[in-house]
């Protein structure tokens, strides 16, 4: 199995910590005036989702995580699982609610997602960065509403609630950034 030293650390690197795959969110090399140099990292455990701050002495080795990121197409959902299909091999993968997490509110039929597999099973699902969804419920816009600083909540076709400008109406399709959950623009 491959190993990484602290000099290899960078955001996005996946490694094993306490028997669980983790990803580095942030890292910083620290050389104090007195004492040994170390690398300060913020890691996120891929299965539990916990975020931890961990310090590694300079030169420490960690085991590489045997995880794989696949570009899969979202197919459908039943009572307990969400199903994804590989676009070339047509292999099916099923993810449970824990693996889906907050991505559920951004999943559209036939959407391309990044699914992270560990030991052949999905442990996390990343939706596309931007999705286009229809507004099914929001307060009506009144005459004089502008695109200023104000906003109102809008319920989208997937059930997600997003703050939108006052001029947006029910039935319109909007573009949303799934990473932040923010309104981007109207779709013409």
Curated annotation (Swiss-Prot):
Post-translational modification, as annotated: May be beta-lysylated on the epsilon-amino group of Lys-34 by the combined action of EpmA and EpmB, and then hydroxylated on the C5 position of the same residue by EpmC (if this protein is present). Lysylation is critical for the stimulatory effect of EF-P on peptide-bond formation. The lysylation moiety may extend toward the peptidyltransferase center and stabilize the terminal 3-CCA end of the tRNA. Hydroxylation of the C5 position on Lys-34 may allow additional potential stabilizing hydrogen-bond interactions with the P-tRNA.
SUPFAM superfamilies: Nucleic acid-binding proteins, Translation proteins SH3-like domain
Gene3D superfamilies tied to this protein: 2.30.30.30, Nucleic acid-binding proteins
Subcellular location: Cytoplasm
Molecular-function GO term, any one: translation elongation factor activity
Domain of life according to the entry: Bacteria
InterPro entries: Elong-fact-P_C, NA-bd_OB-fold, Rib_uL2_dom2, Transl_elong_fac_P/YeiP, Transl_elong_KOW-like, Transl_elong_P/YeiP_cen, Transl_elong_P/YeiP_CS, Transl_elongation_fac_P
Record-linked PANTHER family: ELONGATION FACTOR P (PTHR30053), ELONGATION FACTOR P (EF-P) FAMILY PROTEIN (PTHR30053:SF12)
Family: Belongs to the elongation factor P family.
Protein name per Swiss-Prot or TrEMBL: Elongation factor P
Organism: Pasteurella multocida (strain Pm70)
Name of encoding gene: efp
